[in-house]
Curated annotation (Swiss-Prot):
Gene: rpoA
Name under which the protein is recorded: DNA-directed RNA polymerase subunit alpha
Enzyme Commission code: 2.7.7.6
Example of a GO biological process term: DNA-templated transcription
Summary of the function given for this chain in its UniProt record: DNA-dependent RNA polymerase catalyzes the transcription of DNA into RNA using the four ribonucleoside triphosphates as substrates.
Species per Swiss-Prot/TrEMBL record: Orientia tsutsugamushi (strain Ikeda) (Rickettsia tsutsugamushi)
Length: 342
């Protein structure tokens, strides 16, 4: 494949940072900000990630229960305040984390009076299984009654109805539950403008993810991105051209803003003329000089200095910067490559 075709993706601006912020101090809800993105890619990536997050991540869920003397969902449960439908709904909300096994047996055995909670569930197989919401109420048991329940917990992805879970291995008398395996509860996103230099025609993707605690939100987003990457690989039907590594490495070590030409900074005419007379072409030339050196420039006063300081601050730059690798040996070729990309 030619370098010309490779520019279809290599010339696009790429995100330089991802910011993570917890919402309401809840570690299970995070907002992630990604910028800058090419115009339109914010919506494309946001929608794709949201769909994968809500459909394709794996988790664990209780898929069936068995209570002695109870044959179906409409049967009464002796000594329990709630009917079986409410009990099933409460059991579906039990959050189970299991990493090393695909399926395990759980046991619930309580003597009343008691408020039966998820923390009373025990693992009969001695597997590495954790109940993440032990205070979650399942039912209320009256005095003088016992409640025994065998539960099966399985791994899966997405949402699976009871009709797809029933199989020949199910114990007689087992009641199957709709299983929501996905650890992601809610996903929302929005796209705003992002600024690169003085240009605002780029996208900023703001995506908020809420999970049940089995996986944290930023890890869930990473898994969704990995799923998309894996699925899209099949469409790449060409060999990529290897870039020149030395130049690529050098470009990565230099702040790309330093390769901008000063005329792109939208300065006053007076400041532009002063920089031109001093042969200051790139932003790198500018920040390599000290304020004292700049004030010695003909027709360059404190007002022009303050103007430049304000502009540089927008890029987190200042006068007198050292150890910035300026000027690079192949300045012209790097600057040309920078222009092609931006």
């Amino acid at each position: 494949m030619t370098t010309f075709l490779a520019k279809n993706w290599s010339s696009l601006i790429k995100p330089t940072k991802v910011q993570y912020e917890a919402v309401d101090n809840n570690p299970n809800i995070k907002t992630m900000v990604v910028e800058p993105l090419e115009r339109g890619l914010g919506l494309t990536l946001g929608n794709s990630l949201r769909r994968v997050l809500l459909s394709s991540l794996r988790g664990a869920a209780i898929t069936s229960i068995k209570i002695p003397g109870v044959e179906h969902e409409l049967s009464p449960v002796s000594g329990v305040k709630e009917d079986l439908t409410d009990i099933i709904l409460n059991i579906r909300d039990v959050i189970v984390k299991m990493d090393s096994v695909q399926k395990c047996n759980l046991r619930l055995e309580v003597t009343g009076p008691a408020v039966v909670t998820a923390g009373m569930i025990t693992v009969t197989d001695k597997q590495d299984v954790t109940i993440l919401n032990p205070q979650h109420v399942i039912c209320n048991l009256s005095k003088g009654f016992n409640l025994e329940m065998d539960l099966i917990c399985e791994q899966g992805k997405g949402y699976v109805p009871t009709s797809c879970l029933h199989n020949s291995d199910s114990p007689i008398g087992a009641i199957h539950l709709d299983a929501l395996f996905n650890p992601v509860r809610r996903v929302s996103y929005k796209v705003e403008n992002s600024m690169v230099g003085q240009m605002t025609n780029y996208d900023k993707l703001i995506i908020t993810v809420e999970t049940n605690g089995v996986v944290n939100p930023d890890a869930a987003l990473g898994l969704a991105a990995r799923i998309l990457l894996d699925q899209l690989q099949v469409f790449i039907n060409f060999q990529e051209v290897e870039e020149e590594k030395p130049e690529k490495l050098e470009l990565q070590t230099i702040n790309p803003v330093l390769l901008k030409k000063v005329y792109e900074l939208e300065l006053s005419v007076r400041s532009q003329n002063c920089l031109k007379n001093e042969n200051i072409v790139y932003v790198g030339d500018l920040v390599a000089r000290t304020e004292t050196q700049m004030l010695k420039t003909a027709n360059f006063g404190r007002k022009s200095l303050n103007e430049l300081k304000k502009v540089l601050a927008n890029f987190n730059l200042e006068f007198g910067m050292k150890d910035i690798g300026w000027p690079p040996e192949n300045l012209e070729s790097l600057a040309k490559k920078h222009e092609d990309q931006y």
